Regions:
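Extended carbohydrate-recognition surfaces in non-catalytic/accessory domains of CAZymes
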Residues: 23-131, 188-200, 204-207, 217, ...
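Extended acidic/polar, glycine-enriched regions
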Residues: 167-171, 240-331
Length: 625
């Protein structure tokens, strides 16, 4: 009998247990911090992010390596340590409370990790892939004292085939050496700085997303690309495979259930399209009665992919896709608008930085990760600008499932935040920064990898190569590069940065009130990429006792809501003049910033939710189509 997807997921979660060597959980406790989220108390070495980490490409068999590892901090040029400093809870970065360590690592130091794991006997005669979902920043990976490979970049997943390095049986030794320059001017790091203050936050070093292993045969699917074409009611799918031979074939099913793809209730999914094609060859799957994805109706189609050699299935993965189009459209009054599925669609949502008091870059649990998104929907928004950070795959999965459109920023290169910045005029080439050749190369490498990793996510509707003028260089070339990586989404060349007539979107920032002091005058889609920042430091829920700030500050939720409502009225005025989207700062307080819709610990929502929702829905409805 064919397994339903929910049954397969249950098997996957069971299979993910038990391969990590056992440790004494009494050796771990969270490092002290001023505040923590409600989910921090649920975290333990036995349950550190146990959920399947890659919902876009699910295999039945896998094993999590999250849990307690040994760690040591040495001089950057030191050999592997002879003894370990203590234990660290993976996947939480060493600076975080939930790591159990809570210490900084400088650019003159190296962070070493050590653990052991067992390969299940049922995986014999298969290759074993070792997967790191994110390590900040430069990593060297060793298995059984042999160098397996290197990786640089703090935001993308990487994998190694470790089969040649494994012993035939028993414990396998895994070690990792990490060096992180943070804001040294050579690498993307977003809001991380070595000296946190104001809008700059605690640095993140080392492993900060899940580590896991999975078995694959000599021929296996490595990735796929699913490109929706709403106008043709179809999805173009290309499946890539490693080790495939001439004559091998991939079979692709596109399925829908009664309410679309839902891993909680996948029973009854019906095939709406099928194709068989050689690996690496694109094929079009046409849907007779298409259902489009939107925040109001986030309909997802299930993808099932099988790699076959003759009649034998050698690999099978499952994922999902959606029929969704992001484009420029013109409304009835001649204004260029952001379009969703060929209709003008006002996009309104918070600036979301994705920081946590207890995990820093890493949410304490998957439920916590989902919580911010559920609240965003409850508040009446339909969009999030993901601000100079890349999230774990499950964050985008929840946006896809819940129905939230996302603008995805590229994390800025640290140490490059000064220089010329004149937002309210057209810029010239001399306004672009001069970065080192190393920094430029790193930017293009990491941005290209980020886009490739996230291209299949229906929720993402716009790429943002630069924020303000931070590390903004050769804007025209950066936009061309972004377009070459993905021609199907809108490009916001520099949100609130130096403006060039390239890309699709002209983006201005104004604090605290919503205003457009300069527009593209019809050349591009005009949006307000940041405004607001209404602050309220809620006693008992603060990261620090002083030096907290917002762009303006109040002492009660009622006062915050009154000011927010005033700004909403002003926002409607500029929407009528052609503004097509707006981003409010911000989802939560972050460290010393107290301008969140919620406190940093997520325990207090600062405004009455029903009234906030009504205001936001009124703003969205005000744009004429």
């Amino acid at each position: 009998m064919k397994k339903t997807f929910i049954t397969a997921l249950a098997c996957i979660l069971v299979a993910g247990c038990g391969s990590k060597s056992t440790v004494d959980p009494s050796l771990w406790a969270p490092a002290p911090i001023p505040i923590q989220t409600p989910w921090a108390e649920e975290v333990s070495p036995a349950n550190a992010h146990p959920e399947y980490p890659r919902p876009q490409m699910v295999r039945e068999k896998w094993a999590s390596l999250n849990g307690l590892w040994n760690y040591a901090v040495t001089a950057v040029d030191a050999e592997k340590p002879a003894a370990w400093d203590g234990q660290i809870l993976v996947p939480f970065c060493i600076e975080s409370s939930l790591s159990g360590v809570g210490r900084r690592v400088s650019a003159e130091e190296a962070l070493w990790y050590h653990t052991t794991f067992k390969v299940p006997s049922s995986w014999r005669k298969q290759r074993v892939m070792l997967n790191f979902d994110a390590v900040d920043w430069a990593a060297e990976v060793y298995v059984n004292d042999q160098l397996v490979g290197h990786h640089t970049g703090g935001y993308t997943a990487f994998s190694f085939d470790v089969t040649p390095y494994l012993k035939k049986r028993g414990d396998q030794k895994l070690e990792l050496r990490v060096v992180d320059g943070t804001n040294n001017g050579e690498q993307p790091c977003g809001k991380q700085v070595t000296n946190p203050n104001g809008i700059w936050y605690t640095p993140v070093t080392g492993i900060w997303q899940s580590v896991w292993i999975e078995p694959v045969r000599s021929a296996a699917v490595t990735s796929y690309l699913a490109v929706p074409d709403v106008d043709a009611s179809s999805v173009d799918v290309t499946v890539f495979a490693d080790g495939a031979a001439e004559g091998d074939e991939v079979e692709i099913w596109l399925r829908e259930g009664g309410v679309g793809y839902n891993p909680e209730k996948p029973e009854g999914a019906a095939t709406v399209a099928f194709a068989a094609v050689a690996p690496g060859k694109p094929v079009r799957l046409t849907v007779a009665e298409p259902k489009l994805w939107s925040p109001e109706s986030p309909f997802l189609y299930e993808l099932e992919i099988r790699l076959k050699q003759g009649k034998k299935v050698v690999d099978e993965v499952r994922g999902y896709t959606a029929l969704r189009k992001s484009s420029e459209v013109v409304d009835s009054e001649g204004h260029k608008r952001m379009g969703l599925n060929n209709e003008p669609y006002f996009q309104y949502g918070p600036l979301d930085q994705g920081w946590w008091p207890d995990g820093l870059y890493t949410a304490p649990t998957d439920e916590a990760l989902k919580f911010d998104l559920v609240k965003t929907k409850e508040f009446g928004y339909n969009m999030i600008r993901k601000h100079i950070k890349i999230e774990p795959a499950r964050w985008y999965y929840w946006c896809d499932v819940l129905g939230i459109v996302v603008w995805q920023d590229m994390p800025s290169i640290g140490g490059t935040h000064g220089g010329r910045w004149e937002m309210w005029k057209w810029a010239s080439p001399e306004d672009d920064r001069e970065l080192t050749e190393t920094a430029k190369g790193t930017y293009y490498k990491e941005w290209g990898e980020i886009i490739a990793q996230l291209r299949n996510e229906p929720c993402i509707v716009a790429w943002v190569p630069f924020n303000e003028a931070w590390s903004q260089f050769n804007t025209e070339k950066a936009v061309e590069f972004t377009r070459s990586c993905d021609p199907t989404r809108l490009i916001n060349s520099a949100s609130g940065g130096n403006s060039f007539p390239v890309g699709d979107i002209f983006d201005s920032h104004n604090y605290p009130n919503p205003a457009m002091k300069f527009t593209s005058e019809g050349l591009q889609i005009d949006v307000l990429g940041e405004y607001g920042g209404i602050g309220w430091p809620v006693e008992g829920h603060l990261w620090q006792t002083d030096k907290n700030w917002g762009y303006i500050e109040y002492k009660s939720g009622e006062d915050v809501l009154k000011q927010y409502t005033v700004y909403a009225g002003q926002l409607k005025d500029i929407i009528a003049q052609g503004v097509s989207a707006a981003v409010y700062t911000q989802t939560t307080d972050v460290e010393g910033e107290v301008n969140g819709l919620m406190t940093y610990d997520r325990k207090i929502v600062k405004m009455d939710v029903e009234r906030l929702r009504a205001v936001n829905q009124d703003v969205i409805a005000s744009m004429k189509k």
